[in-house]
Amino acid sequence: SRLLGLLRDVLVFATLGASLWNSAFILAFTLPNLFRRLLGEGALTSAVVPLFSDILEAEGRTGAFRFLNQVLLRLLLTLLFFVGIGMCALVWLSNSSWMPKQWSLGANLAVWLLPYMLFICLSAIICAGLNLIGRFAVPASTPIVLNLSMISALVAGLWLNAEASSIVYWLCVGVLIGGFLQLLLPSIDLLRQGWRPRLVFQSGTAMTEL
């Protein structure tokens, strides 16, 4: 994963260099990554893991998966709200005449990248569930999937001799495809373990604690 990350960074600088587009992409990618650290890999996961573990021990996988569905539904609704509001605000900012060019480009690219937040935060919760039932391979491979997707997008842009202004959007698409795969692959693995996605609106004791 680290080698692929290094290759990705090398390709990013080979294609975008120290250009305005590179700075704008880094700025845009910071926002979903911040939410990933706060929601996907931060406080929320730290709160969910012990509760999921307790339910898994007391009620087995059926109860644990029900709790997981409760968490995923509420997280999905929260993320949809923030992504929707964020995209509207970013579209307005990117079209504002008073915004510096770099910030305007960053806001425009962030409109493309903000949905990545949806994929990666949901993926983090599912991966936490997989880890707790002893499934480690797929969660560990998710960063590799993102790097491969971004590398593929950059290579495609280079192969087509695209300009930096076009390659940066290829890179955004690569991030979105990678994020979708980061959610899809753990979901498939969890489905094989007996999980079934359900819309569970009721809040049990564990959700109240959470």
Set out the residue ranges of the language-model regions.
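Membrane-embedded alpha-helical bundles of multi-pass transporters/translocases
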Residues: 1-210
